Amino acid sequence: MNTNFVVNEYALVWYLLFQASISEPIYKIKQRLWDAFKDKYNNMFNDKLLILEDYKNFIPNDDTIYNIFFESKEYQKIRKQVEKYRLEVMRIWDKNKKVTQKLYSNIIREKVDEFTFFVVSKELNIIDNPIKEKAIIGIEIDKKDTTEYLLRLNMVLVMNSIKKYNEEDNDFKNDIVELAILNEYASNLNDRSCYLNGTPSLMELKRWIYPYWLMYLGIPKDELLSRMMRDKIAFELDNYAYEKELVKMNLEEFIDFCIRNKRYIIREQKVTKQEINKFQQMDEVPEEII
């Protein structure tokens, strides 16, 4: 997997111009440029996709505003900060390369040949993925715990690699990608279960998918109970036939399987929400769930 982290000056200026101002000096530069070159400023809006599609060869139709921005002291200061930030991002990525490679070989089961992250100021607080295989990253890094940052990078990568689904089925895609990144991958990074993390509105769907997800991961039938205990997600084992073919699928195929079989997966379960809440705080599995 070839993942690149680059600073492209045109992309950096574009996001500084068209996102919320990150400082008073930047706001003043933008206001001055708007007052002096309103038409040119408006025309630059369409440059974003052109820059990202062919960033190595991009030449603006009109470079007036870009050049003024490049020459400003405030931009030079930000440019140095962004390069320092880029090196920090690369250090986090490289440090976790082995466990990330396992994510793609064992969990996603799909190669990401090449992906480019355009690094911008973290003061912009942005993750943007406007075109395939390219994304903008500019968010704070928690120095004490870089795991969250790594998870967000990989959410972008995996979401980008999977086809689009219709609105009705999109929750299945989002939920299963969360299972892969925010739950299984995060558990591997932290050496503890992270299966209660994720979008609250998707938790009920996640509980329905979870037994099949364990089969997809290749967890043996006689270990399902211990995984249920570890992850604190209750389901009735006797209600599920063990689907041996799931372990042969990649993530996108598993999403398709769940969508095709959703009327069987989303079933009435005897385990109530009250029992689940109680179960999540227990150290032993109650017999009625076994």
Residue ranges and their predicted role:
Residues 50-82:
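Long, hydrophobic/aromatic-enriched structural stretches that serve as scaffold segments
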Residues 73-135, 191-195:
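Auxiliary, metal-adjacent structural segments of Zn-dependent hydrolase domains
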Residues 137-153, 167-172:
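Short pre-active-site segment immediately N-terminal to the catalytic Zn-binding motif
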Residues 149-164, 180, 184:
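Catalytic glutamate of the conserved HExxH
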Residues 199-290:
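Pan-zinc metallopeptidase signature
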Residues 86-94, 143-144, 171-175:
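Short, charged/polar micro-motifs that form catalytic or ligand-binding hotspots
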Residues 1-44, 105, 164-236:
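Post-HExxH zinc-binding segment in Zn-dependent metallohydrolases
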